[in-house]
């Protein structure tokens, strides 16, 4: 947003406004002031959008804003689980919907969004964060995109949408399903906690953004309180020790809160 504002005669009037698809139906709008944005521009913009009956959240001018930053592991970790041979697309989606309560599994959602679009967003975020391994793109998604398996719009993606096509059924193993759900959830929570740590948004607005912007069954920080931050930290530390990859590093705020026995909400 700041780079766009730099080209204006009056940069104080620049502000980012991010709707969610489909915009007439999805209630959330992210409002992103740049470093040049005046208080007047921010207040007028928020008042206008509130007047449309939208739910607004304020976030820092960083890659992905709140939602597209925090949601990366929903796709990235699901792809990683598939690449490790732990489960197929259908089983991972089953785990996230039937056990996790999400409206769509990650592969169904990526097919809905379009693999070309979702991959491009991931690649852009990865580059913008100076190649932080937490946002590393997947070769599986890259190859699907290159093959033209873009999802619903092309008739094929992770699933086959052509008339008469038969897709594999999930393996409904409760133990494996719980492991899949737990792994993706703790990664999502870690991103949400880190967004608080880096002042990307307030804890209330981060939880609001994820429930109203991408229909998560509950806010991730509230979820962390319910599970227990200490349990989330244990799972992340176990993955970090097993893989030795920086993508699994726990947020410093999580470590601090566990050490002090703190919660996000009372």
Report each predicted region and the residues it spans.
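N-terminal glycine-rich phosphate-binding loop for ADP-containing cofactors
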Residues: 1-266
């Amino acid at each position: 947003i700041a780079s766009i504002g730099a080209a204006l005669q009056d940069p104080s009037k620049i502000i980012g406004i991010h709707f969610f698809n489909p915009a007439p139906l999805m209630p959330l709008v992210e409002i992103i002031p740049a470093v040049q944005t005046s208080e007047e521009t921010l207040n007028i913009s928020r008042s206008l959008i509130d007047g449309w009956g939208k739910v607004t959240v304020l976030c820092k001018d960083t890659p992905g804003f709140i939602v597209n930053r925090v949601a990366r592991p929903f796709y990235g970790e699901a792809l990683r689980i598939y690449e490790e041979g732990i489960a197929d697309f259908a089983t991972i989606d089953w785990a996230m919907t039937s056990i996790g309560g999400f409206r769509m599994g990650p592969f169904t959602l990526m097919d809905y969004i379009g693999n070309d679009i979702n991959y491009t967003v991931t690649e852009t975020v990865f580059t913008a964060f100076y190649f932080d391994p937490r946002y590393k793109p997947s070769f599986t998604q890259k190859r699907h995109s290159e093959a033209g398996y873009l999802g619903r719009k092309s008739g094929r993606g992770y699933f086959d949408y052509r008339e008469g096509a038969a897709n594999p059924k999930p393996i409904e193993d409760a133990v494996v399903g719980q492991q899949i759900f737990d792994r993706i959830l703790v990664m999502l929570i870690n991103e949400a906690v880190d967004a608080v740590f880096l002042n990307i948004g307030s804890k209330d607005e981060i939880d609001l953004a994820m429930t109203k912007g991408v229909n998560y069954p509950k806010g991730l920080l509230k979820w962390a309180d319910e599970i227990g931050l200490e349990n989330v930290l244990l799972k992340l530390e176990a993955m970090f020790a097993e893989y030795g990859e920086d993508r699994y590093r726990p947020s410093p705020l999580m470590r601090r809160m566990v050490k002090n026995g703190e919660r996000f909400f009372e």
